[in-house]
């Protein structure tokens, strides 16, 4: 690592190494070995002639002759012992041995070689001669080599100086890495290990790395070693002198001395021990502040070392000695650390590894002591100067030391707080890092990252892994400022860095930078009326620079303040160190995972969008509340942001803040949620961070992701950054970061944690968080008027009312909201549930604002409705009203979308079923299950607000299915409502292209709404809510299809591609995610799929072992995602289903493998597997793909939303299916979903009804529910184990709708439209026909559900959609669901379906 210290093995070891160096072969020995080639070849040939295995014995004999030594004393003692024991048999042997002892070592070796070869050869003749010849040859070789070496040594008084630097470096590096085991006075250079050298030769570099990298540039490490002994002495005398003075003068003197010292061997040999023991111990912790910094200083040269630390040299020598004495024990390092720290504090004020406090504890190896010192040092100007210099010089230079130094110091288990984290946290001194460094950072990131010096320094001091190498951030502060600052401030550089650097590298940075980046776009462009996330989404390509600049400003200005406040408070409340540690650990773990603390911390700083700091997001509501108590918006955003933080853990982000109890760590895609749980407060931050991290790579996404209004990274970051980075986009369509991010987010939502644990945690945590939220949200919410407002990023005109009930309900309904982490959302839900009409009215009122109070109300109300009024008629009424709003008021399309979404959520309680919102061409509402949560994507206006709301019955079930998150996409914000906590769940996960601020459709279209933002929700239904379903087998699980116990529970990949009408121009760039894209490609269908805009939503319910393969809309069917709309239009004509059938002649056949597989293996499919997002390969690929395609086709059949419908289907349809078609339920559900989606938009119920009337009729009727014991069981017993069907049914049916609800729905559907539709699918009236008619049934059910909803919602499109969702669940469930949702509509819908 320290080239300077490199011992020239060739020169230096010459004799001393060969003779005295017990460890590595001396240079002479090495050269001899090189010269052995010819001899070895000759010997091999000779041995082969004797019939001896040359391969084995050549090397053995040579080794024996060249290296073996003989201990005469021991041999004689042994002989005596043997003689004493047996004078008989061993007498001769002993005598012979004695004779041997009389022999010379050479003779003994020869004898041993002869005996060895004779034992291996049949022929005894010729071997002695051979050995003699061999020995003579070897002697010649050795004499020649010795002559060469002597000449070499004589020729140059200082062979080391003579030796080429590369040779020195190589040898020195080698010995540094592999120090000799013995303490013999070998040449110091030789002895120098990476540890030693870093102490002796590069310990200056270590100090320089932390203190003055330039000083560390003293690269004559081997010489340094020789002169270092002197220098050490000199330094010890000079220690008092300033580090720079000493280092510079001594580095020069020492260099000269070292180079000039021809007595390198002498001094090093003597001094090596000293150094190894003395300096090594103390100085051992070279600049572990950053391995790269130290390496840089070392590589930069020992000059810098000498300059920077004359003291350091002494210290290092001492440290080395101590190390050597202690065998480089962590203890000795630690012991040295303190002294070293003190010295370092002097020397490295700006030591990158200024995590002195934590370093001591964390770094027991003494690697970090330097960091610790660096942290302590920040106070010392000199140290700072050195540090700055060193940082500049050794920014990314890594001293060779890191090779052998335990990298664990740098690399920490992803799940743990890495030592780095701890160091960084401890490095709060880094806040003192150096005013220079801080200033530098502050220029780019100071506002955000450095708002709390702690935080920034944490990042800087922490260092980062770049290209797999750990670079100490402090050393890289300049670049880090770009990197960290950029990432924090969304600097254009940061974007580059983020892309170039892996998340793991910038984890600590990402906490802040991504958030800031996300905020920046919002702050600048989003501030212009669009949420950052939306802005970012829209301008992903152009955002990088703009976002950075504007975002920086916003962050630095307003957001910085928020961040600082948050960071400061966050640090104080959570403890900056703890947060950072957690953050870093989480980040280190995986960007994919939502880092619990780090993300939150960053999120916190970016809690709000440009108006609201994301910082609030940092620490869930609690932290945010404290930090942002005065900043309601921030807090709301924080809550939202928390959820957004989780956003990348699919939808947990939404819940993160409010659902912090949800333990996004658990729910957050479960990847980093574990950390999150450790860091409850940090969790939310983590979510944001993760999402930030995940989306950090896309600077634009960052900013946008942290939607200003949304204040949750989800808005934009989830779309691309978080998901892309974290989950490595599973969908081919990563072009749309919305979809990408969501895609990433979705997978592993709950896979990480056990659902029950998550649920319990969510519930407990929800209560805690609710209380926190209640305490905090009221302040923030009232301030901001509403959490929804902050979530939606739109001030709700009705926010006053909403805000009040929101706030009130935060307290009151928080428990009621089933663990609404965020009381606001829950209260909104409650409000919706209680006053569905009110919510609808609000939505109507806010037609102009679309995203004002209405959107917020809707978001919350939607969830509340779905949750509180699971299958209540009031919900239906609200839904109907909202639906009408959708259909009636395109201008209030967003509002309507919200209403529809609400309607859809409540209505199509099954998360799999797309809600009616999709029905209306203006506003496409997609209901889908994301992260185990039933979600609806709704487009409002061209804004295409998406609201994903849990089904009304989710109230209990979602809560129970804590793992399942409900993603509410309201307006441009995506809110994640965890199954358990809806209130927090309504945080925006991400903002759609359109931001609430830009309510107008032009906004969606023009604003760069994201060209179509598609978000993929990859949810592990089982992981999220399997346990809950098991716990409450049936009705209460919003995600009936995701029964944790149901191995069949599918991970739902929902890709929502949203292209606002205004974004039509962007549509080319927008590619619907494979599964989610419903209508991205064909705008013709976009009315269906994308409400006003082209919203493509495709949800594929995938059985746990289902192979999920992103399927493009075109691949699935001509209509692709748009088919849902298209088909809904066709549905009335019954074309889409046939079309679907045409595409896949037997869509169910395709699904059957999945369903059967899931049913058969579902039980065996471990919940943990599902939770972990792993799908068993057991599912046949063709079957899986077919099922996926079929489900997609079915989706397209019913609507592009089929996938959504499918997933909802999983809940509702699947329930019915399970009742109707246990094995086929998966397929049928998928298909039904498709049909439902078709119906959803245009009453695909027509088509569905026609195809599935009979089938639907059978399953739909409550009697049929009873008819199908499986379904009944699912509804009632919810016994997954009852049958394969049963678990399916239970998963799909009972959780979605209580038996009574399902029955009611069925009754409604049947009574209203069930009979009418029966005729259509009557051919499959019985269970036998379930499989065949399942698709039809699903369609019919969709239609029926749509009809019910239609009646309820007064808008056929919406109702159709809703009903579709319901019917997609299954005919029975669909009917029932539809009935539940909208009794009268169902009839109408079915009539239309029949049409």
UniProtKB/Swiss-Prot annotation:
Matches recorded under InterPro entries: DUF4603 (IPR027871)
Superkingdom of the source species: Eukaryota
Comp. bias regions, Basic and acidic residues: 230-269, 337-346, 369-391, 1346-1359
UniProt source species: Homo sapiens (Human)
Molecular function via GO: ATP binding
Keywords for this protein: ATP-binding, Nucleotide-binding, Phosphoprotein
Region (Disordered), start-end ranges: 146-166, 205-391, 1110-1132, 1346-1395
Listed Low complexity bias regions: 155-166, 205-222, 287-301, 349-358
Comp. bias intervals (Basic residues): 313-328
Residues the entry annotates as binding ATP: 89-96
Keyword check for Nucleotide-binding: yes
Residues modified as Phosphoserine: 814, 1080, 1194, 1338
Protein name: Uncharacterized protein KIAA0232
Pfam family membership, one: DUF4603
Gene: KIAA0232
């Amino acid at each position: 690592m320290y080239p300077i210290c490199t011992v020239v093995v060739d020169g230096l070891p010459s004799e001393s190494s060969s003779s005295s160096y017990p460890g590595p072969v001396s240079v002479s020995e090495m050269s001899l070995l090189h010269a052995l080639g010819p001899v070895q070849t000759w010997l091999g040939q000779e041995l082969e002639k004797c019939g001896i295995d040359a391969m084995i014995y050549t090397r053995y004999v040579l080794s024996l002759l060249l290296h073996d030594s003989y201990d005469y004393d021991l041999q004689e003692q042994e002989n005596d012992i043997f003689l004493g024991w047996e004078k008989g048999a061993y007498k001769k042997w002993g005598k012979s041995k004695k004779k041997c002892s009389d022999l010379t070592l050479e003779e003994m070796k020869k004898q041993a070689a002869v005996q060895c070869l004779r034992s291996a050869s049949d022929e005894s003749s010729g071997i002695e001669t051979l050995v003699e010849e061999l020995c003579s040859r070897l002697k010649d070789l050795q004499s020649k080599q010795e002559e060469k070496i002597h000449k070499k040594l004589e020729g140059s008084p200082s062979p080391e100086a003579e030796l080429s630097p590369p040779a020195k470096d190589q040898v020195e590096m080698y010995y540094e890495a592999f120090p000799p085991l013995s303490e013999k006075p070998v040449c110091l250079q030789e002895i120098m290990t990476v540890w030693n050298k870093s102490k002796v030769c590069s310990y200056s570099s270590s100090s320089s790395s932390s203190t003055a990298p330039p000083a560390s540039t003293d690269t004559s490490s081997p010489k340094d070693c020789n002169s270092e002994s002197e220098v050490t002495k000199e330094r010890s005398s000079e220690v008092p002198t300033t580090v720079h003075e000493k280092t510079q003068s001594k580095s020069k003197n020492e260099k000269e001395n070292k180079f000039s010292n021809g007595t390198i061997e002498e001094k090093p040999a003597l001094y090596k021990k000293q150094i190894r023991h003395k300096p090594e111990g103390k100085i051992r912790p070279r600049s572990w502040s950053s391995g790269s910094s130290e390496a840089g200083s070392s590589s930069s040269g020992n000059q810098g070392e000498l300059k920077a630390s004359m003291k350091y040299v002494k210290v290092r020598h001492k440290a080395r000695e101590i190390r050597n004495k202690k065998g480089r024990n962590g203890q000795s390092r630690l012991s040295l650390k303190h002294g070293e720290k003190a010295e370092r504090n002097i020397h490295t004020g700006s030591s990158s590894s200024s995590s002195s406090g934590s370093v001591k504890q964390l770094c027991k190896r003494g690697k970090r002591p330097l960091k610790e010192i660096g942290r302590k040092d920040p106070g010392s100007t000199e140290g700072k100067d050195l540090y700055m210099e060193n940082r500049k010089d050794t920014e990314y230079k890594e001293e060779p030391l890191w090779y052998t130094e335990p990298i664990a110091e740098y690399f920490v288990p992803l799940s743990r707080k890495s030592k780095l984290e701890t160091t960084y946290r401890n490095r709060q001194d880094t806040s003192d890092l150096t005013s220079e460094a801080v200033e530098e950072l502050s220029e780019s990131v100071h506002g955000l990252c450095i708002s709390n010096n702690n935080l920034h320094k944490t990042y800087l001091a922490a260092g980062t892994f770049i290209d797999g190498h750990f670079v100490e951030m402090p050393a890289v502060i300049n670049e880090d400022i770009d990197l960290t600052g950029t990432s924090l401030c969304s600097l254009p550089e940061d974007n580059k860095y983020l892309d170039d650097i892996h998340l793991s590298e910038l984890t600590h940075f990402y906490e802040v930078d991504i958030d800031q980046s996300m905020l920046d776009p919002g702050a600048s462009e989003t501030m212009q009326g669009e949420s950052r996330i939306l802005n970012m989404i829209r301008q992903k390509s152009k955002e990088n620079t703009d976002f950075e600049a504007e975002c920086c400003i916003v962050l630095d200005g307003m957001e910085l303040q928020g961040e600082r406040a948050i960071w400061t408070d966050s640090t104080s409340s959570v403890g900056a160190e703890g947060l950072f540690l957690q953050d870093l650990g989480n980040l280190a773990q995986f960007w994919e995972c939502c880092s619990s603390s780090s993300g939150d911390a960053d999120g916190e700083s970016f809690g709000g969008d440009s108006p609201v700091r994301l910082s609030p997001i940092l620490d869930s509501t609690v932290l945010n509340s404290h930090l942002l108590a005065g900043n309601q918006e921030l807090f709301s955003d924080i809550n939202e942001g928390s959820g957004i933080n989780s956003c990348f853990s699919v939808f947990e982000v939404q819940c993160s803040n409010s659902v912090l109890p949800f333990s996004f760590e658990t729910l957050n895609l479960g990847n980093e949620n574990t950390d999150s749980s450790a860091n409850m407060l940090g969790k939310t931050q983590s979510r944001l961070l993760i999402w930030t991290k995940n989306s950090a790579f896309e600077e634009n996404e960052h900013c946008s992701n942290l939607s200003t209004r949304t204040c949750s990274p989800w808005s934009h970051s989830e779309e691309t950054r978080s998901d892309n980075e974290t989950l490595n986009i599973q969908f081919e369509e990563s072009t749309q970061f919305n979809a990408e991010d969501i895609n990433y987010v979705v997978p592993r939502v709950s896979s990480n944690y056990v659902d029950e644990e998550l649920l319990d945690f969510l519930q407990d945590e929800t209560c805690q968080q609710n209380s926190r939220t209640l305490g905090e949200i009221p302040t923030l919410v009232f301030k901001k008027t509403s959490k929804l407002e902050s979530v939606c990023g739109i001030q709700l005109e009705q926010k006053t009312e909403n805000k009040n009930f929101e706030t009130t309900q935060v307290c009151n309904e928080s428990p009621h909201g089933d663990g609404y982490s965020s009381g606001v959302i829950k209260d909104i839900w409650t409000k919706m549930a209680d006053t569905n009409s009110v919510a609808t009215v609000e939505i109507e009122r806010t037609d102009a604002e679309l995203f004002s109070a209405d959107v917020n109300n809707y978001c919350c109300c939607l969830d509340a409705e779905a949750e509180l009024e699971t299958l209540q008629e009031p919900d239906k009424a609200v839904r109907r009203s909202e639906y009408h709003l959708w259909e009636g008021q395109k201008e209030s399309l967003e509002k309507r979308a919200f209403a529809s979404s609400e309607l859809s959520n409540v209505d199509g309680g099954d998360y799999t079923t797309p809600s009616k919102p999709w029905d209306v061409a203006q506003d496409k509402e997609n209901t889908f299950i994301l992260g185990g949560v039933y979600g609806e994507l709704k487009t409002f206006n061209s804004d295409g607000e998406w609201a994903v709301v849990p089904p009304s019955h989710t109230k209990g079930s979602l809560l129970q299915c804590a793992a399942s998150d409900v993603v509410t996409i309201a307006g441009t914000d995506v809110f994640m409502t965890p199954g358990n906590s809806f209130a927090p769940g309504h945080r925006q996960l991400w903002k759609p292209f359109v931001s609430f601020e830009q309510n107008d459709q032009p906004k969606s279209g023009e604003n760069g709404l994201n060209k179509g933002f598609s978000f993929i929700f990859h949810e592990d239904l089982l992981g999220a809510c399997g346990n809950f379903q098991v716990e409450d087998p049936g009705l209460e699980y919003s995600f009936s299809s995701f029964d944790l116990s149901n191995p069949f529970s599918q991970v739902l990949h929902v890709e929502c591609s949203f292209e606002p009408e205004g974004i039509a121009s962007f549509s080319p760039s927008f590619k619907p995610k494979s599964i989610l894209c419903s209508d991205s490609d064909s705008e013709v269908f976009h009315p269906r799929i994308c409400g006003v805009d082209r919203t493509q939503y495709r949800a594929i319910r995938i059985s746990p072992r289902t192979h999920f393969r992103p399927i493009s809309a075109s691949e699935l069917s001509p209509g692709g995602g748009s088919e849902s709309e298209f088909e809904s239009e066709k549905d009335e004509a019954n074309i889409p289903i046939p079309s679907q059938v045409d595409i896949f002649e037997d869509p169910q056949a395709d699904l059957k493998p999945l369903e059967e597989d899931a049913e058969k293996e579902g039980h065996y499919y471990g919940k943990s597997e599902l939770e972990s997002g792993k799908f068993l390969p057991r599912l046949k690929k063709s079957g899986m793909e077919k099922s996926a395609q079929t489900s997609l086709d079915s989706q397209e059949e019913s609507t592009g939303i089929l996938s959504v419908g499918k997933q909802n289907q999983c809940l509702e349809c699947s329930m019915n299916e399970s009742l109707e078609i246990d094995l086929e339920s998966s397929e049928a559900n998928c298909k039904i979903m498709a049909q439902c989606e078709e119906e959803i938009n245009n009453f695909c119920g027509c088509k569905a009804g026609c195809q599935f009337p009979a089938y639907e009729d059978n399953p739909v009727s409550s009697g049929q529910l009873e008819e199908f014991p499986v379904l009944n069981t699912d509804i009632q017993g919810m016994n997954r184990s009852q049958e394969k069907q049963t678990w399916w049914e239970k998963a799909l049916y009972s959780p979605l709708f209580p038996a009574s609800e399902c029955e009611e729905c069925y009754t409604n559907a049947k009574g209203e439209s069930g009979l009418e539709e029966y005729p259509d699918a009557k051919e499959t009236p019985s269970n036998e026909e379930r499989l065949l008619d399942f698709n039809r049934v699903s369609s019919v059910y969709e239609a029926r559900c749509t009809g019910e909803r239609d009646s309820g919602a007064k808008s056929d499109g919406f109702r159709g959609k809703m009903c579709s969702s319901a019917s997609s669940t299954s005919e029975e469930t669909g009917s029932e669901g539809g009935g539940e949702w909208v009794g009268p509509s169902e009839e109408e819908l079915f009539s239309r379906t029949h049409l």
